[in-house]
Regions:
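Active-site Gly/Thr loop motif
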Residues: 281-284, 332-385
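Catalytic-site signature segments of enzymes, centered on catalytic residues
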Residues: 128-129, 195, 208-288, 298
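Structured C-terminal helix/loop/strand segments within mature extracytoplasmic catalytic/sensor domains
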Residues: 23-42, 366-413
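Bacterial Sec-dependent N-terminal signal peptides
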Residues: 1-26
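Active-site SXXK
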Residues: 116, 133-157, 181, 254-258, ...
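Active-site-proximal alpha-helical segments within enzyme catalytic domains
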Residues: 184, 250-257, 296-320, 370-387
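Active-site helix/loop module of the DD-peptidase/beta-lactamase fold
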Residues: 151-194, 233, 262-298, 302
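N-terminal leader/targeting segments and the immediately adjacent pre-domain N-terminus
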Residues: 22-126, 183, 187, 408-413
Length: 413
């Protein structure tokens, strides 16, 4: 009987998986059972429709720390722009409406906020109350905690990291500035997106060792027993501040720094410094290791509206209203003034953990197609969630699609 049940589940799920780009809002108990039975806990990122589920329900697969909502949530006014109905996106195969274009990319949800008002909002394969993984978009939440501590004079961005984390004294981290870590220029031997070296598949890779120690990836013989001892033992492979190299380890150290300075857990820091003050309407959460260690480089999950609300903190009016406490105009200028990379990762910058800052727009992306765009002066925020393909494609919207959206925002005045 048990074998027959397994056969039925297998056939049913094979049909379900056959359309990996299908958008699905709800799941039967049978589908959920098979998902949990099929996914090794640490390979939730396998891609396709399995990841469509895990990206939406990370708390079913990992321990989490709760990030508490505000008692006075921000109420988004709604004023849909008619101009969005006429947006046409050109592609290699023809033209598509905005809705059809987003569906083709299997976007889970998409929101556009202008001057604090929702002008476009669609949910394709998640619900408004769902808490979707941010992946690396989480990095700019971590860097915002750091900028708030800098603005409170609790951290000197030019000071060496071991001054704040004594455990790093005598290690290769010694004499590396907080600023170099913020800007992905620490020089430490870890590159998280040099995919040919296997950062997520090769147990000998430094990133794999970090993430397996946190429970993100499957444990191997090379998995460290202590993530902190592992970080202390890392070596440099370049001189700090010479070359940017995208590294999850840098962001993890920033999270460690924030916890060390304040004596508080990461989830509580996000709650107290960002989520409650900004008027979050829903609790969020951050995934934890089995030892209760947060993933500050990509472990958060939140509703789409709360991600957009976070983005609003970087608009000109919000920075002024908060007296530059979370982020200052000088820090925004540093992000835009940072030189773009000159290697294969151009035009990325990774200044203060942000990927891009050009033509007035800041952007941060995350694995699988999460993204946050902010035009501070025009008071525009665009945010969306997606899930990873079986080939780990990112499915970020194209520059031309972004341009058409920005163009539509100047209409209907």
């Amino acid at each position: 009987m048990k074998d027959y049940k397994r056969f039925v589940l297998t056939v049913t799920f094979a049909v379900w998986l056959s359309n990996s780009h299908a958008q699905q809002l709800s799941y039967t108990a049978q589908e959920i059972e098979f998902i949990h039975d099929s996914i090794n806990k640490s390979r939730w990122d396998i891609g396709g429709r399995l990841s469509q589920y895990t990206f939406r329900y990370m708390s079913e697969f990992f321990p989490v720390g709760v990030i508490q909502k505000s008692s006075q949530p921000y109420q988004f006014p709604n004023n849909p722009k008619k101009s969005f109905n006429s947006i046409i996106i050109k592609s290699k195969t023809g033209t598509l409406s905005l809705d059809d274009y987003l569906k083709k990319l299997h976007i889970a949800s998409f929101i556009v906020v202008q001057k604090g008002v929702v002008v476009y909002e669609k949910y394709f394969s998640m619900l408004p109350d769902d808490k979707h993984t941010l992946q690396s978009v989480n990095k700019v939440i971590t860097s915002t905690i750091i900028t708030s501590l800098i603005n409170e004079k609790k951290i000197d961005v030019n000071q060496s990291i071991e001054k704040y984390i004594p455990e790093l004294q005598g290690s290769d981290w010694q004499d590396i500035s907080v600023k170099d870590i913020l800007n992905m220029r620490s020089g430490m031997d870890n590159r998280s997106i040099d995919f040919e070296t296997g950062p997520f598949t090769n147990p000998l890779h430094k990133n794999y060792q970090l993430e397996s120690a946190l429970g993100i990836l499957p444990k191997a013989e090379t998995t460290p027993s202590s993530v902190y001892k592992y970080l202390i033992g890392l070596k440099k492979d370049t001189v700090p501040d010479v070359q940017a190299a995208y590294s999850n380890i840098n962001t993890f150290v920033l999270g460690w720094l924030a916890e060390k300075i304040t004596g508080k857990k990461y989830a509580d820091l996000v709650t107290e410094r960002i989520w409650k003050p900004m008027g979050a309407s829903s609790d969020a959460y951050v995934c934890l290791s089995d030892q209760g260690i947060a993933w500050p480089h990509g472990g958060m999950s939140a509703t789409l509206r709360d991600l957009a609300r976070f983005g609003m903190l970087f608009t000109k009016s919000e920075i002024k209203a908060r007296n530059e406490s979370l982020v200052s105009f000088a820090q925004i200028k540093e992000i835009f003034d940072a030189p773009p990379l000159t290697n294969s990762f151009a035009p990325f910058k990774w200044a203060y953990q942000w990927d891009l800052a050009n033509d007035g727009v800041m952007m941060k992306g995350g694995f699988g197609g999460q993204a946050l765009y902010i035009d501070s002066n025009k008071e525009i925020v665009i945010a969306y969630y997606n899930y990873v393909d079986k080939d780990w494609g990112m499915n970020i919207i194209s520059d031309s699609a972004f341009s058409e959206i920005m163009k539509a925002l100047t209409m209907d005045k």
